[in-house]
Amino acid sequence: MKRAVVVFSGGQDSTTCLAQARHQYDEVHCVTFDYGQRHRAEIDVARALALKLGARAHKVLDVTLLNELAVSSLTRDSIPVPDYEPNADGIPNTFVPGRNILFLTLVAIYAYQVKAEAVITGVCETDFSGYPDCRDEFVKALNHAVNLGMAKDIRFETPLMWIDKAETWALADYWGQLDLVREETLTCYNGIKGDGCGHCAACNLRANGLNHYLSNKSAVMAAMKQKTGLR
């Protein structure tokens, strides 16, 4: 039996990954993290979506220690969430240092226990947010280290790594989940489901991608298929 575990936030990207994984694996588990994030509503959204999309199991792990260690606008209400601009060093204040290091490591431990062959994460380098832990180089390096540390061959999959946000919408549409992703996921840094607040960087990226996809469906779908190998 082919098993996979999805790092699942209930946002556009991880929900699209879950929708695809349900077609590619016999059994799919989801892991969501409570790290005291500003947009904690995503945890309840993730629970509902994991159930709706047929995840075999869904775990919510408490990693609130990360909130104490990592200062970010996503972990501190006193720091305003930006619209577009990163800091002078190119890293936006929404970056939570160590988040993906911790998340991927913990999910790999869970995958080891349930005998899953893959850990799936929705990180992407194409519409680069400036987050160093979303880079392909990082994911591959951590995957290698984790496998060495557990003497296990668990594959870190990044289905969205080389597609842009419009193509991510196309991928959701390909799997018949465009409306669900648009209406029921939570990507907004301010914790508003669906189309979100319309102002934060996450909402702007999501909306621009959706508008581009809806205006150029056939071309974007074709580009997505070419990049992902889907037919």
UniProtKB/Swiss-Prot annotation:
Database matches in PANTHER family: 7-CYANO-7-DEAZAGUANINE SYNTHASE
Pathway: Purine metabolism; 7-cyano-7-deazaguanine biosynthesis
Task performed by this protein: Catalyzes the ATP-dependent conversion of 7-carboxy-7-deazaguanine (CDG) to 7-cyano-7-deazaguanine (preQ(0)).
rRNA processing as UniProt keyword: no
Reaction equations catalysed: 7-carboxy-7-deazaguanine + NH4(+) + ATP = 7-cyano-7-deazaguanine + ADP + phosphate + H2O + H(+)
Taxonomic lineage of the native organism: Bacteria, Pseudomonadati, Pseudomonadota, Gammaproteobacteria, Enterobacterales
Family statement: Belongs to the QueC family.
A GO BP entry: queuosine biosynthetic process
Keyword Transmembrane helix appears in the UniProt entry: no
Name this polypeptide is given: 7-cyano-7-deazaguanine synthase
GO molecular function: ATP binding; ligase activity, forming carbon-nitrogen bonds; zinc ion binding
Cofactor note: Binds 1 zinc ion per subunit.
SUPFAM superfamilies with a match to the protein in the record: Adenine nucleotide alpha hydrolases-like (SSF52402)
Transmembrane parts of this sequence: none
Binding site for ATP: F8, S9, G10, G11, Q12, D13, S14, T15, T16, C17, L18
